[in-house]
Amino acid sequence: MPPIVAIVGRPNVGKSTLFNRLTRGRRAITHDLPGVTRDRLEAPAEIEGRFVTLVDTGGMDYEAEESLARQIVEQAEAALVTADVVLFLVDGKAGRTALEDDLAERLRRLGKPVIVAVNKVDGLERVAAMTADFHAWGLPLLAISAAHGQGMAELAEAIAERLPEAEPYDPDAPLVQTVLRLAVLGRPNAGKSSLINALVGESRLIVSDIAGTTRDAVDVVVHQKGKRYLFVDTAGVRKRTRITDGLERYSVAKALSSAKRADVAVVVIDATGGVGVQDKRLISFLDSERKAFLVAVNKTDLVPQKDMLALQKDIARELRMCSHVPVLYMSAAKGKGVAKVLPQAEAIWAECQIRIGTGELNRAMRASLDKHQPPLVNGRRAKFYYLTQAADAPPTFVFFVSDTERVRDSYIKYLENSLRKLFGIATAPVKVVCRASHKPKDER
């Protein structure tokens, strides 16, 4: 397991900017507003030839009384417990604060290597003036500019010097590979973080009744039965008219981008609110992208039993255009029904990998084509010559026909349903494409 380097500090000192700089990617959301990072983010980074896990934490404010602020501090403290090296980031322009004096003393008591990185120091001539105050702590100190990349080489060297010795390579050690990458989507406060916490078995993500608690896409690894699952907990997707700032707009865009990169998406719906407009749009987006997904109806413990049948009918009605999508009913807070999520996602992904030979495809589909021929369009009927599977994930089938304009959407849906029935594709998305082609020479 690679050593862990945690970045901590008060709000808005540039922790996420430094995180993005060291991981060589714009992975954490950065913004001028304090408190942008709420959960702790993890990503691999290479420091002086050593691979480490870098952890970005939310701003630590021990004086804050709000529940959300306290949970942010708890997440940061959890990162400190597992850290091998701590980067204590401070703002050189703002100077030392009483809050940071308190935090410095707490870090000293940890007994772990701590490096004070004085950020926002632009220009060598200002180093002495902007770092003078921070020497009072008696901790190793460096001046950097995360935004402009200044001092990064010195910082990397200081980190590398404090890393624990690398574990010897064991060629017989079993390799644990990621089975699935899953994106968790849904409206704000639907219970996405609660679902992941229930699967992990700890409060890995901040859970709050304040809508919009999660702003970044946070990767969380779940180990179950010797398998490794990578979950991405995403910002809530809400109506455009309710997105009040640029930060939240970027969070939503990143959530949808995470869904595209995932193997399987999990759409979390709040059972107490039913299927909302944004739930419908999100499902429509995933269906149009032919993305593998399942629906997790959360908070069923808060729905009276007499209303459950109406809820199930409502969800079935909204999924009628993508009836292959599995629906799970659960209560993440109570831990009920959660155990079905990973096996179901794995089953969907297994179907996404299906490969069918061209000969087998054509023999099996010939009966379906003969039984239900394409309808006449302007007095003529499209001729189907042959088909082949062009790709998997999702399974994509290309039909070569005489005239694509004579193939109606309803007939394409019939072809999709026939393929599902013939080859046992029950829960994965299926993509059917018709391509114009001349009649094969051996049929002329």
Swiss-Prot record:
Residue positions binding GTP 2: 186-193, 233-237, 298-301
Species name: Solidesulfovibrio magneticus (strain ATCC 700980 / DSM 13731 / RS-1)
Keywords assigned: GTP-binding, Nucleotide-binding, Repeat, Ribosome biogenesis
PROSITE patterns in the record: G_ENGA
BP-aspect Gene Ontology terms: ribosome biogenesis
UniProt lineage: Bacteria, Pseudomonadati, Thermodesulfobacteriota, Desulfovibrionia, Desulfovibrionales
Residue intervals of the KH-like domain: 354-438
Protein name per UniProt: GTPase Der
Task performed by this protein: GTPase that plays an essential role in the late steps of ribosome biogenesis.
Residues annotated as domain EngA-type G: 3-167, 180-353
Keyword Repeat set for record: yes
Family: Belongs to the TRAFAC class TrmE-Era-EngA-EngB-Septin-like GTPase superfamily. EngA (Der) GTPase family.
